[in-house]
Amino acid sequence: MADQLTEEQIAEFKEAFSLFDKDGDGTITTKELGTVMRSLGQNPTEAELQDMINEVDADGNGTIDFPEFLTMMAKKMKDTDSEEEIREAFRVFDKDGNGYISAAELRHVMTNLGEKLTDEEVDEMIREADIDGDGQVNYEEFVQMMTAK
């Protein structure tokens, strides 16, 4: 799994790993994971942190080492860039199926997700993704937005 990563990606993940590994001992504990999650505005319980560690902790020693971290990141990357998932997400937004996401369609979906956005905010989201400037988002633009690093 991790052997499909580029050297650049591995270097980036090493940097991320170091942010988690506060004491620099080469492993991430539940305490260190909790610190980082809270700094990102999350509020995980001790049990949730333990579950997260257990999911990744291949050797069962209760902490995450760098190879385990790499495997997790490689899995996540494989999962997120799935062409089919992006196509499905596009279909959710493109209510009338015309191949474009309009401001009205975007507002509708965001409202259903519980996000009350102003017209300005919706227009801004469209503008950010709208590469050709036609005022709506086509599939190519949507893919660009979803896969932008």
From Swiss-Prot:
Entry binding sites for Ca(2+) 3: D94, D96, N98, Y100, E105
Entry keywords, A to Z: Acetylation, Calcium, Metal-binding, Methylation, Repeat
Domain EF-hand: 8-43, 44-79, 81-116, 117-149
GO cellular component terms, semicolon-separated: myosin II complex
Superkingdom, taxonomy of origin: Eukaryota
Short name of any one Pfam family annotated for the protein: EF-hand_7
InterPro entries: CALM/Myosin/TropC-like, EF-hand-dom_pair, EF_Hand_1_Ca_BS, EF_hand_dom
GO molecular function: calcium ion binding
List of residues binding Ca(2+) 1: D21, D23, D25, T27, E32
Residues modified to N-acetylalanine: A2
Residues recorded with modification N6,N6,N6-trimethyllysine: K116
Residues that bind Ca(2+) 4: D130, D132, D134, Q136, E141
Keyword presence, Zinc-finger: no
Disulfide links within the chain: none
Residues engaged in binding Ca(2+) 2: D57, D59, N61, T63, E68
Family as reported in the entry's similarity comment: Belongs to the calmodulin family.
Function per UniProt: Calmodulin acts as part of a calcium signal transduction pathway by mediating the control of a large number of enzymes, ion channels, aquaporins and other proteins through calcium-binding. Calcium-binding is required for the activation of calmodulin. Among the enzymes to be stimulated by the calmodulin-calcium complex are a number of protein kinases, such as myosin light-chain kinases and calmodulin-dependent protein kinase type II (CaMK2), and phosphatases.
Further information: This protein has four functional calcium-binding sites.
Protein name per Swiss-Prot or TrEMBL: Calmodulin
Source organism: Electrophorus electricus
Gene name tied to this protein: calm
